[in-house]
Amino acid sequence: MGEPNYEYMPNMYEPLSYEAYSENFIYDDNLSARIPVKGTIPRGYSLYEYEDTNEGYDLAKKELSNPFSLVEEDFLKAKELYTVHCGICHGAKGAGQGILVKREKILGVPSYADPGRAITSGSTYHVIYYGKNSMGSYANQLNEKERWLVTDYVMKLKSDLSK
C-alpha cells in the first residue's frame, strides 16, 4: 500500500507572495511591484530631520548630537575612515592642507581650528550628510554610524589644533 502524500511546509513550494515583476490581476495596472506609501522608511535606514538649507544647517549646528556611545576601537575605525574620505582635502591633522590642496587641485579648504567657523558635531555631521560649498555629500559612502565616527574624529582634530 502507498503512504499518504504529504508536503512538508507547502508554502515553501507554493509561495504566498507574488514575484516582483509578475503580472498581478488585483491592481488595475497589473503590476506586483508597488511604490511605497508616502512617509515610509526602508528597513535599516533612519530619518534625518534636518533640511539641506542654511536654516537646516544652523538648526543641526545647535541641536544635533551623536546618538552612539563610542568605544576605543571606534577611534581606530574613525581615523581610517577620515584618512580615506577626508584627509585627501582636509589633511591628516585637519589643518586644510591635504594632498589635493598642496598640489593646488582644490583651493580654500579651511582648517578645523578656524575660529570664524565654530563647527560643532551637529554642523559637521550635517555637512558630511549633505555637503557644503565645494565639498560633496558623503551620505552614500558612509553609513550613519560611520558618519558619526568621522564627526567625532573631526571634533578631536579640532580640539588638537586649538591647543
Descriptions of predicted regions:
Residues 2, 114, 137-140:
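Short, charged/polar micro-motifs that form catalytic or ligand-binding hotspots
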Residues 11, 67, 111, 134-137:
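Conserved beta-strand positions that form and line the central face of beta-propeller blades
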Residues 84, 96, 133:
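Glycine-centered loop/turn positions within well-structured domains
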